[in-house]
């Protein structure tokens, strides 16, 4: 039913018995079908006498007013071809069911479904299978995957077979390097699933460069970039580039809105939020040239720090460190999580409750959380459903204890008489800012650099006459570095350098966890007065398990386990937390107020204590 299953090479046809029927829902003529079908699919179809049909339910659904809902058309086509019951009976039964289901929505909706049923029974076309398909040969794979070697290896050995629904073919040895459950960040960028039939196209002349489209995008597939003249000059031919129209960067940079058609889910959220209709949905195939533009901007265009700030517009020039997740098209949960990573992602820990946010956030081998060009990104972990808050608190306390020990070592280093002045200055700057995440970032980097520069090698020690004999003794023992107090402490600090920068600790979960099953732990954690941030994706039902009512569901709300409407009011988690008197509490909805959402997230991180 989705043409991307064919273009990605899923082994869909291999389950059809010889002489069976295989129908593809697509907008292609025969030449395009011949181009998109993989060689193994062609061979199977030809050698097993498969009856091949195509149907363009995509355009038919749009023409009759059903939008993306083409399932009724396809169901009718199925019954027409499968002959599991007389076609006339199948059409009659479907129409009776459509009337029973949709009459309350009006006769127009019923008639629309009738039309879809009638069209589906006649709109398919039989494809004459060429004899040469029996000997079709795959073109050689000339792709060169770029990135961290460990990540590329994981993508080739695990992600690609799993992505083609061929994971059962993997030997146990393929997971030898992942036995502890750790997977490399950023694998989702290699999927390029191409599942959207329609994707947005950008009108550069209409655009007012507000970046609201990128702000709401759940999948980080539409991103603004500020380009230097050189970067603009080297951009692919398909790039649409204009001058920055107002505010920061005007007269300095050029602007483009890069869209990734192969990562886009086609939800249309960006279209709905654009205040000047500068975006419109068009068929994906016509926009594939924009993929090169997106890839170029991500890989070659530098981040412009002077364009970034904690405003709706400025925040979107920051790299999202959650991208191309497997969440449902238009899912708002990922919009919020992505925004948090843009603000704090390079020094962020995440403890994630089981639920929707752990499914899109941590699927094995396809992590959508990613790192920046320096290799820094969110560290993500998932424990059990009910103990996520305690797990997150443990992550915070653990790294906080390590940092307190590092602070004590740093004070000892400063006290060493012969330690270099520039090292002492860097150490003091780190100590002075160690509890402020944003202010601590640069001092932490500078401290690491000063530590690396300060350690004296045995060869350097030997060059100093009064230490030559001691250097010879160290060399005889196989030592590489000086063993004085300053060098010893510096080496130990460097061995734990990933803990030097102040971490932004976030605890993610849904309302089923926060209001119900994990509430006891959440209450315990906010009562601890520790500096952690808790973000609840309140969907007002247990989303991942099928929409069951939770204590976050509203009175009268119809949900699973509340078919007649929930009889009690929504639990006020915010008011409960406020009774402690020292918990930062905020409710946010980016669709209602983008600025307030940003402000609340920034305030939560800045507050030295628990935030909800």
Describe each model-derived feature in a short phrase.
Residues 6-8, 30-32, 61-62, 208-209, ...:
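Flexible loop/turn segments at secondary-structure boundaries
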Residues 348-352, 446, 503-517, 532-535:
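A short, small-residue-rich loop immediately preceding and capping a beta-strand
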Residues 469-470, 474-495:
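Amphipathic alpha-helical binding modules
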Residues 11-12, 33-38, 64-67, 129, ...:
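Short acidic, glycine/serine/threonine-rich loops at helix termini
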Residues 1-161, 232, 236, 556-560:
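Active-site cofactor/cluster-binding pocket
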Residues 90, 103-264, 271-349, 354-445, ...:
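Ferredoxin-type iron-sulfur electron-transfer modules and their immediate structural context
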């Amino acid at each position: 039913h989705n043409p991307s299953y064919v273009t990605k090479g899923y082994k869909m046809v291999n389950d059809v018995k010889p002489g069976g029927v295989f129908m593809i829902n697509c907008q292609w003529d025969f030449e395009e079908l011949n181009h998109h079908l993989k060689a193994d699919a062609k061979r199977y179809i030809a050698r097993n006498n498969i009856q091949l049909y195509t149907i363009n339910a995509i355009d038919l659904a749009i023409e009759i007013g059903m939008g993306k809902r083409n399932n009724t058309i396809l169901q009718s086509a199925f019954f027409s071809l499968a002959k599991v019951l007389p076609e006339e009976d199948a059409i009659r039964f479907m129409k009776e069911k459509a009337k029973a289901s949709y009459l309350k929505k009006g006769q127009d909706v019923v008639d629309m479904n009738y039309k879809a049923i009638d069209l589906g029974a006649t709109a398919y076309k039989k494809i004459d299978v060429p004899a040469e398909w029996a000997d079709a040969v795959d073109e050689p794979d000339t792709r060169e995957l770029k990135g961290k070697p460990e990540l590329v290896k994981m993508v080739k050995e695990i992600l690609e077979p799993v992505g083609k629904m061929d994971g059962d073919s993997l030997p146990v040895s393929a997971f030898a390097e992942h036995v502890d459950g750790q997977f490399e960040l950023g694998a989702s960028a290699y999927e390029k699933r191409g599942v959207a039939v329609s994707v947005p196209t950008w009108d550069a002349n209409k655009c007012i460069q507000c970046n609201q489209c990128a702000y709401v995008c759940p999948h980080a597939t539409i991103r603004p970039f500020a380009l230097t003249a050189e970067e603009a000059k080297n951009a692919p031919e398909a790039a649409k580039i204009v001058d920055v129209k107002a505010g920061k960067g005007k007269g300095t940079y050029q602007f483009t809105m890069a869209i990734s058609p192969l990562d886009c889910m086609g939800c249309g959220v960006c279209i709905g939020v654009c205040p000047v209709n500068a975006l419109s949905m068009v068929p994906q195939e016509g926009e594939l040239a924009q993929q090169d533009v997106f890839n170029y901007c991500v890989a070659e265009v530098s981040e412009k720090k002077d364009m970034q700030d904690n405003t709706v517009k400025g925040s979107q020039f920051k790299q999202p460190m959650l991208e191309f997740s497997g969440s449902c098209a238009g899912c708002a949960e990922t919009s919020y999580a992505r925004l948090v990573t843009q603000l704090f992602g390079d020094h962020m820990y995440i403890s994630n409750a089981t639920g929707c946010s752990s499914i899109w956030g941590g699927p094995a081998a396809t992590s959508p959380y990613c790192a920046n060009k320096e290799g820094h990104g969110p560290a993500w972990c998932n424990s059990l459903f009910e103990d996520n808050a305690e797990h997150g608190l443990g992550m915070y306390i653990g790294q906080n204890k390590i940092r307190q020990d590092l602070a004590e070592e740093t004070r000892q280093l400063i006290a060493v008489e012969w330690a270099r002045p520039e090292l002492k200055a860097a150490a003091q700057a780190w100590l002075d800012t160690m509890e402020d995440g944003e202010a601590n970032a640069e001092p932490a980097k500078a401290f690491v650099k000063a530590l690396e520069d300060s350690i004296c090698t045995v060869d350097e020690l030997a060059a100093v006459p009064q230490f030559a004999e001691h250097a010879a003794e160290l060399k005889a023992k196989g030592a590489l570095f000086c063993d004085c107090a300053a060098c010893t402490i510096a080496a130990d600090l460097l061995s734990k350098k990933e803990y030097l920068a102040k971490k932004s600790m976030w605890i993610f979960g849904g309302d089923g966890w926060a209001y119900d099953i994990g509430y006891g732990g959440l209450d315990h954690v906010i009562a601890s007065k520790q500096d952690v941030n808790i973000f609840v994706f309140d969907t007002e039902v247990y989303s991942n398990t099928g929409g069951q009512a939770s204590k976050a569901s509203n009175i009268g709300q119809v949900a699973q386990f509340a078919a007649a409407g929930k009889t009690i009011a929504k639990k006020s988690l915010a008011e409960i937390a406020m009774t402690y008197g020292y918990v930062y509490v905020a409710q946010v909805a980016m669709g209602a107020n983008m600025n307030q959402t940003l402000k609340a997230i920034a305030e939560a991180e800045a507050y030295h204590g628990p935030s909800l």
